[in-house]
């Protein structure tokens, strides 16, 4: 296990295009690093406060580059994040929850299509397929960029209309092993987007309810971080130790469950999956969706 280099996150961030008063944190490498094959790519985050977050991982990337002659170290095109990249007054506090849900269903998000923007935590990698959540942090232009950059992979755009704040996929749609996914019951994948899963005998089951009614203090995520588990292999999963319902469900689904106390870290950026990024894998790239059908999610 390697750890990022601490940075001074409370200092202002400034570029020729914007200024913001502080950074974010280095707790969630899942948001920044995307591993595909022998390549680790730094993301093109849409939050201005995360513009220089990749610097926390720069020493590790440089180390991997020097140690492994086959390692590819890349950076996605950096977005400028000018005012044109966002819809103004999108987060007006006078907008009701019902209106937010209507926006999500209509795929009306704060980001525009001026430039590709994406967080790595919006990308669910399943062998030869990339399922990318279209939401507040990743736009459709980013998916088109992925399609061109990885022509040998299939890129799918998915969205979850029940989520009023769709940011990242790991508390919504989580693969546990080939053929099995747990889905947030409040944010179900629409029926028309399930065709590719059904054609390849994947089972999508509702996730167990969270054990808590409210998030811990200062946490900006929902109680559904209960789903934000770390899958070690096809039989082993780490779950936050207080999430008794989720652990019970994992056990019934045939997983070996490792409870990990982690709730106190939620305020710094997320759950167990958020706090990790895999940098080394064994085996080849499998095709878990060989049966291709008329798929509305395909980019």
Question: Each PLM stretch: what is its role?
Answer:
Residues 1-299:
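The feature marks the mature, well-folded catalytic cores of soluble enzymes
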């Amino acid at each position: 296990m390697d750890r990022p280099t601490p940075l001074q996150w409370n200092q202002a961030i400034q570029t020729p295009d914007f200024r913001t008063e502080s950074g974010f944190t280095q707790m969630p490498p899942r948001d920044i690093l995307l591993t595909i094959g022998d390549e680790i790519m730094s993301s093109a985050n849409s939050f201005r406060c995360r513009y220089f977050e990749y610097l926390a991982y720069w020493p590790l990337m440089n180390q991997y580059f020097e140690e492994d002659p086959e390692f590819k170290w890349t950076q996605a095109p950096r977005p400028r994040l000018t005012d044109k990249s966002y819809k103004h007054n999108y987060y007006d506090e006078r907008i009701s929850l019902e209106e937010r849900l209507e926006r999500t269903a209509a795929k009306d998000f704060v980001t525009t299509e001026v430039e590709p923007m994406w967080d790595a935590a919006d990308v669910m990698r399943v062998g030869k397929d990339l399922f990318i959540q279209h939401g507040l942090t990743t736009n459709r232009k980013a998916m088109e960029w992925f399609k061109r950059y990885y022509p040998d992979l299939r890129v799918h755009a998915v969205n979850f209309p029940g989520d009023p704040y769709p940011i990242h996929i790991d508390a919504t749609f989580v693969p546990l092993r080939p053929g099995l996914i747990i889905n947030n019951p409040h944010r179900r994948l629409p029926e028309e987007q399930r065709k590719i899963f059904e054609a390849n005998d994947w089972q999508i089951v509702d996730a167990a309810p969270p054990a808590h009614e409210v998030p811990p203090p200062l946490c900006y995520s929902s109680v559904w971080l209960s789903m934000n588990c770390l899958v070690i292999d096809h039989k082993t999963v780490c779950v936050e130790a207080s999430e008794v319902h989720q652990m019970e469900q994992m056990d019934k689904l045939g997983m070996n469950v490792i409870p990990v106390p982690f709730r106190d870290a939620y305020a710094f950026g997320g759950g167990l999956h958020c706090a990790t990024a895999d940098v080394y894998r064994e085996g080849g790239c499998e095709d878990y969706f060989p049966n291709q059908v008329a798929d509305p999610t395909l980019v």
